[in-house]
Amino acid sequence: MSQEIRAIVRIGDTDLDGNKQVAYSLTKIRGIGIATAYAICRKLGIDPHAILGALSEEQINKLDWAVRNLHELAPAWFLNRRKDPETGKDLHLIGAELVLAAKRDVDLMKKLKSWKGVRHSLGLKVRGQRTVTTGRLGPVAGVTKKKAAAGGK
């Protein structure tokens, strides 16, 4: 009895490779790392080393639900957005939501003119790194050689 393997599986609004193991396929979703992928598999009782495309439709639906609702399965310290400034809830954002939330956070810092916001708006380093020799922007100035001196003695 041969089992058909789907080449592409859609989970969390992302197309995943169905020929890879479940845990490693889940890491292709932005916001899901390897530790999170293994935790999801462990919570759902799915073998993380099974081939994703070989899973049943029910198991794939369970995975999709778990990826979207990780805040219900995992403790607060495991989530990527704790105490959201707008709602005050612990969330785990994935995909485009994660990118937009980070952009909104930076825009809010710029609007409030906090130290980090000012650094972001000036395009400088934000986390206290040195800026004298590293992180230089723009074209390289380069060095020009002087013309060789005319014949010697």
Curated annotation (Swiss-Prot):
Belongs to the universal ribosomal protein uS13 family. Keywords: Ribonucleoprotein, Ribosomal protein, RNA-binding, rRNA-binding. This is Small ribosomal subunit protein uS13. Located at the top of the head of the 30S subunit, it contacts several helices of the 16S rRNA. In the 70S ribosome it contacts the 23S rRNA (bridge B1a) and protein L5 of the 50S subunit (bridge B1b), connecting the 2 subunits; these bridges are implicated in subunit movement. GO terms for molecular function: rRNA binding; structural constituent of ribosome. Pfam families: Ribosomal_S13. GO terms for cellular component: cytosol; small ribosomal subunit. GO terms for biological process: translation. Transmembrane segments: none annotated. Part of the 30S ribosomal subunit. Forms a loose heterodimer with protein S19. Forms two bridges to the 50S subunit in the 70S ribosome. It comes from Pyrobaculum islandicum (strain DSM 4184 / JCM 9189 / GEO3). SUPFAM superfamilies: S13-like H2TH domain. PANTHER family: 30S RIBOSOMAL PROTEIN S13/40S RIBOSOMAL PROTEIN S18 (PTHR10871), SMALL RIBOSOMAL SUBUNIT PROTEIN US13 (PTHR10871:SF3). InterPro entries: Rbsml_uS13_C, Ribosomal_uS13, Ribosomal_uS13-like_H2TH, Ribosomal_uS13_archaeal, Ribosomal_uS13_CS.
